[in-house]
């Protein structure tokens, strides 16, 4: 059955509500209900019933189920690492290295490298990198605006470029919700990484800024202020959030409790990918590898906690479930996104939009348009996950229908979504970067804005060019 114009009403309504309410859950929920109403012919009660069952149907996909389970396990892993002193142990080791840092440039580069090492979570990266680097950044008179800029740029953007964590499950899940076959999701994701220009520029552009001291506009003023007056913030600004952000573990610092589980996670993922791919990791079973990696990593940290007498068996199980609970909001967005994606497929929204825009919009401009729309939505809502959940089910089906490179459009969607996480003043990583470095939020947004706009502009041009080439 063809739904015509009505097939675009639910996704458009979802986008508008996300922009107005800043609440992705409510927006997706209303989008799911509206989609079900359109599919059943407009009967509200039937639509409500169908919307309920659409959530159940989401679990018929093994890929969706594995993704959600893996995400919860990642939450348990990170939580137990923190509670067992793993993060504190790693922090202690890094602090011992600060005696080797003698210059501002060295401090900036060390902060960048530390952000690269912490790749499992954008929030965790902000917390660890910001708190570890702050003492020597402050001692060497690095303005808090510069510290926050580096900490922020190496958090979520790097997690997306190096997704050996819960991000692997999330990004692959968004691809499948957009119509990419489950057995091809990991391959498409890997091919999209070199095409995620915004994240590449954000991470390595920040390295260039650190190496060569490229200070633009407000950042130049911040550097001059720190150099001339010794003040790391504008008068009366900065530092207020630091104590709230820090919640260190009471356990004895144990770096092993971070390095061993993370090593098991990475090694298991690579091993299962190689085995299931018959020697070729890119052809391996990505979702199964992530699930096994998470299971063995969680098992490893649980054994360490019990062996070190930090928790009893019952206590470590309770702590594990507490950790899973920390990931429920993100898992909820994933579930809602998967469900919305299934309904949008049933509405055939992608093919309808393709038929409408074919005569008006060159298919080659789809990657650039996808990037731009995701930028705007993520900046307004402050959420990359929510933007990916909403826009993947719109942009990817159009790419499939138009015959446009799916990795290129996926890179555009993911990069545009990360722009908001990176640039928006209401993003959680923006707040956390400022909290751990002691920077005022508005000062951080103002000083990094010239850089992120340059990165975004270059990315947009590349998507326009490659849209015609690929």
Positions of predicted regions on the chain:
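Hydrophobic transmembrane alpha-helices of multi-pass small-molecule transporters
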Residues: 1-71, 197-199, 210-211, 227-339, ...
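Structural signature of hydrophobic alpha-helical transmembrane segments
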Residues: 1-8, 290-296, 355-366, 415-423
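Generic transmembrane alpha-helix motif of multi-pass integral membrane proteins
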Residues: 11-22, 373-378, 397-399, 434
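Membrane-embedded alpha-helical segments and adjacent helix-loop junctions characteristic
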Residues: 45-148, 310-402
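Alpha-helical transmembrane segments of multi-pass membrane proteins
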Residues: 103-118, 142-168, 182-201, 222, ...
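Short helical (or helix-break) motifs at transmembrane helix termini and adjacent helical loops
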Residues: 127-136, 417-432
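Membrane-core helix-loop-helix motifs of multi-pass transport proteins
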Residues: 136-231, 248-256, 430-462, 467-470
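Helix-coil boundary and interhelical linker segments in multi-pass alpha-helical membrane proteins
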Residues: 396-408, 465-470
